[in-house]
């Protein structure tokens, strides 16, 4: 009984020790009653996170029955039993103090990284002497102390009941292993499920973005073969990878990969290594009893959010970064795709436009000439230019071009545009409708022409409504018989003529297909309220005339350029645009009449005409017919239409500027007219551009300012220098500055010079043209070419109607001679003509500006009408007195016209006046030479006699003699060397002949 009681006492002491050790983090601390057997308690460390210590092997709680069966020694039987139990426990502890771990039982990486290890009390801390001590029996951490106490008490009862030795019940090793296996399996299954769910929920980051490392944690995913297969399949479908641990020490990091196959291989390799690592850790945790305590909670129980440092928080953080990167990449890809789609659409649009252009070209060739001509007449612009709308359908070619014969712009083509844009099937029907709307007024105009031409052929010159032959004389009766308005009897019997008068669509520009010269066919309808009505201007007899539409200012420059390209595309298209209403001219000019609609200018809507200053009566709305101009010595009688009893003045009347006179005539009515509102002096196709048409534009709004006020303003404003290539010549007076808003004065920089060095010469200052004197007295090549373009555009217009029919026939014959190349002066004169008739190529002695020995040939084909000259020059806004002075300087024909040289020099003088220079008293001959057709300047420089010429000649002779002696010596030396060489050669030849003879003799012997 004593042995049994000692064992029970030892078991109770062990139970108390286990309870005490569990309260201090499961560290076994022995409570030895003697001081030498007390276990040293290690100092508690402060780990950064829960650390899993390596558990001890469970100790079997057994009671040595052999001690009880053996007879107790004398003395203290309890002491001997306790000593035996202590020795047995020490032996087992020594075996456990140095365990041999297998590779599978390697501690996890978190234990090594944290730098902490499981500190167990070693046997060295315990004294060797165990006598007189009661050993503390170790109990498993998982075995409750109450179970051991209950087992001990039950054994004591049974032993006391049966009065015999009964072995103490022991907790079986199989039971403990089963409990540990179940607990470890549950923890591993939960960890595997959570890790698999996290990896599947991870977003797929882009290949170009590095994923952030997942934070180190003890929660490592345990992946099976099925999970690895599913994850690999997910990686293939998404073509991306997830960041997973690739090494047991640190998580792996996938970088940038260009090949998707390489990405798949790396991901599969990382998943396999992670699975191996997780399996090793799980195998170790199977034997651990602290696994469930050291697992971090994934979700915080307080906030419901992912716990910091957990795998889920790191995964969510990496997923958010990856998702934002994916959004940016997707937006960039969408922008690139959108840009590619836009480029593709533009390319398709260009291809469609090219196909439409080809179709339009075929359509142009297939359409008849009248259809094309009326298209150009009623739609001033490139009507064949089609554009592609937003829907990819062709827009109506007439869109943007309002027909002139309608009151509302575009009224006839609204339905046509709807059909073109709405339904492609109605294109042919809409084009037929528009063609009918165009052909209807054309047929009415043709009928009007026929009705007008029929009575003209049947009636004589006395009954003709617009006679030409009786208008040769300028008596009052001839002028009074002319119909000047629609209410007069001359036009009352012709309704078609009245309709033509009311129609403002006139043929503006006519171009001859046999000559590059352009002419003016429409002139301003001037005020007819005054007593002195302007004369009628007869048509221009140009053979093979073809229409060229003149673009208005409202059209854009792109339309003008496109129209110019269209007209210059091919000669066949140019010839196909013959105007059906152009007059057919016979040999006799008396029958060459023109319809009034071709003479009357076209008024532009929205621009008010400036009223005349001298005319007090209101302007009449009815147009005025002009009469043909007669050839005379001056331009005064021909332009005013007054009787011939007026004194002959040298300067034309339209340059006098008498705005206050009652009988102002053409000068008073035209003094304040807009410069280029009606006259279209610039053709769309010709390379010769109008000089003043672009530079001196008319004001945007109507005003009552006179030309003199504008001229005074022009004197004060700065001007621009002539630029090469036909660019801007003078600053626009009406657009740049007005009297209401004068230009600001130049701002002076002031201050002292920063350097005393001489500054380099600057370029030409266009605000101070008087400081530039180079080439100021002659025309430059650029100026001459520019003025030649204006002259070629307007030469020969209205000039033949100065002559009588016989003179006109002579002019036609001479023009044929020009075409055939007969340019002899004898062909220009006509000996059979009367003395009164003047040939178109008349020898005229020059005026005071040219020497008496010079002869100028006046060719009417090259002359420019004085009326056109006045319209051109008045666009410069110079005073009429100044323009009259320029006319007197350049007028060499004295017949109301200017020849080529006079016109070019006059334009140059107008430009010089705009620069601020004064007019010369007479034109320098060098200026006339610079505008000649054969402008070849040969400069002959005469050498002046120099001093000491005799000495220089003597020295020159000595030098020549010395050189001659040296040359002689060189020649002699060369001859001597040559002779020596010849002698040596002869000697060698003689020796060779001698040897040959000797050999021959020896052979014969």
Swiss-Prot record:
Residues 246-258 have a biased composition (Acidic residues). Residues 1-170, 183-219, 239-258, 272-350, 402-587, 602-624, 657-682, 735-776, 942-1005 are annotated as: Disordered. Residues 63-75, 111-126, 204-219, 280-297, 320-333, 451-466, 497-522 have a biased composition (Polar residues). Positive regulator of phosphatidylinositol 4,5-bisphosphate turnover and negatively regulates signaling through the cell integrity pathway. Involved in rDNA silencing. Residues 1-18, 76-86, 127-161, 568-578, 608-624 have a biased composition (Low complexity). This is Increased rDNA silencing protein 4. The lineage of its organism: Eukaryota, Fungi, Dikarya, Ascomycota, Saccharomycotina. Residues 408-419, 763-776, 961-1005 have a biased composition (Basic and acidic residues). Residues 948-960 have a biased composition (Basic residues). Keywords: Lipid metabolism. One of its GO terms (cellular component) is plasma membrane. The keyword Lipid metabolism applies. Pfam families: EH. Disulfide bonds: none annotated.
